[in-house]
Design a protein with these regions (language model features):
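Extracytoplasmic small-molecule ligand-binding "clamshell" domains
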Residues: 111, 116-118
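N-terminal helix-turn-helix DNA-binding module of bacterial transcription factors
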Residues: 1-66
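Bacterial carbohydrate/catabolite-sensing allosteric modules
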Residues: 2-5, 17-18, 50-51, 58, ...
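N-terminal pre-catalytic "stem/leader" segment of glycosyltransferase-like enzymes
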Residues: 87-94, 108
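Short, flexible/disordered intra-domain loops and linkers
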Residues: 82-90, 118, 142-151
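Short beta-strand segments enriched in small/hydrophobic residues
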Residues: 25-27, 64-86, 191, 199-203
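The feature primarily captures lumenal catalytic ectodomains
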Residues: 138-139
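A short, flexible beta-alpha/helix-coil linker loop
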Residues: 29-33, 79-84, 170-173
Length: 351
């Protein structure tokens, strides 16, 4: 006898009983697999569904859809302060490349956030969850270690999401696409020394670039002079680099070259030197690190160490997608290749 569908919720068990099949067979018909069902049996199940008025469990379907969506969903978390980071052409280009590549690969960027937002428990529990994302990309993660209280947040994040890739540096032994800033700085400074410069100022950031600057001097038998180095304010890059360039050339008139921590600082330095009536590279040669798009179109064009941003993004997605299919317990980090791009600002012939 047909049950009263206005009184009771019809289940898959009811359909199976009416059709004279197992519940598994009903599931195969509803989901088109994974096992094949004969045409005769399929018709009996479909007839039972029609007679009983069966409707799939919407809640279960939503959970299934959510799980499927989460599998292809990625979160991006950036260290540092939001507005300051995205004002930097280097980082804004990386973020844009991440979104573009995700779209090409049919991956969904579920959220892009700054680490400071994770200190809000509501935000953390809503987003750092396997029902929301399967993978995480950590951009500029060294800035996430600025406060002791962040340690617990990071460890909870690692416990919840097991497919994580860091961009630039590794933290907590997580796999990373590592940018060797020390080697990049050594490359840029050595280029100036090989061109005959011995008095090289440094517009610095408080990171591994300082070690690379010092190592280049040591390798070429030159002393490190503290007075030749100014540490930039990373929250006001352009104005800080402009002002410190003027201070350096006024206080150290013997300088014949400058190494800037990044392209932004170098561009500000070129402007400052121009405003003081000095020519680049005739009076002061300049090198930097990043090779942003602006480096090639300013005049003089900037000699700078190329950071392979597009390759970094490509490697990141290759890693995350590979880990989903063939997870490796302790995946190795990858050192990103760097290359000096020689242009007019260093005064060297083009290569």
């Amino acid at each position: 006898m047909t049950r009263n569908i206005n009184r009771d919720i019809v289940t898959q068990e009811d359909v199976a009983k009416y059709a004279g099949v197992s519940r598994a067979i009903v599931s195969y018909v509803l989901n088109n697999g994974p096992r094949n069902v004969s045409e005769q049996t399929r018709n009996r199940v479909l007839n039972a569904i029609q007679v009983l008025g069966y409707r799939p469990n919407q809640h279960a379907q939503r959970l299934k859809l959510a799980a499927s969506a989460a599998e292809n969903s990625i979160g991006i978390i950036a260290g540092g302060k939001g507005s300051n980071l995205l004002e930097r052409p280097y980082y804004s280009a990386i973020v844009a490349n991440l979104f573009d590549r995700a779209h090409e690969l049919n991956q969904q960027i579920r959220f892009f956030s700054f680490f400071e937002n994770l200190t809000d428990p509501v935000f953390f529990n809503k987003n750092i969850h396997r029902e929301e994302i399967s993978s995480l990309i950590l951009l500029h993660p060294s800035m996430m270690l600025s406060e002791p209280a962040h340690d617990q947040i990071l460890r909870q994040m690692i416990e919840r999401i097991d497919n994580i890739i860091c961009l630039e540096q590794s933290i907590y032994n997580l796999p990373a696409l590592v940018l060797d800033l020390s080697a990049a700085a050594e490359m840029a400074v050595s280029h100036l020394i090989e061109l005959g410069h011995e008095h090289i100022g440094f517009l610095a950031l408080s990171d591994d670039r300082i070690a690379g600057y010092k190592r280049a001097l040591t390798l070429h038998g030159l002393p490190f002079r503290e007075e030749y180095m100014c540490v930039l304010d990373g929250t006001a890059m352009l104005s800080s680099a402009y002002e410190m360039t003027i201070a350096l050339i006024e206080q150290q008139p013997q300088l014949t070259a400058l190494f800037a921590a990044n392209d932004e600082a170098a561009i500000a330095a070129i402007a400052a030197l121009h405003d003081r009536g000095l020519s680049v590279p005739d009076d002061i040669a300049i090198t930097a690190i990043d090779n942003t798009e602006t480096a090639a179109i300013i005049r003089p064009a900037l000699t700078t160490v190329n950071v392979p941003r597009r390759e970094m993004v490509e490697y990141a997605f290759q890693f995350l997608l590979s880990q989903r299919v063939h997870p490796v317990a302790s995946p190795a980090s990858i050192m990103l290749p760097i290359e000096l791009i020689v242009r007019e600002s260093s005064g060297a012939p083009r290569r």
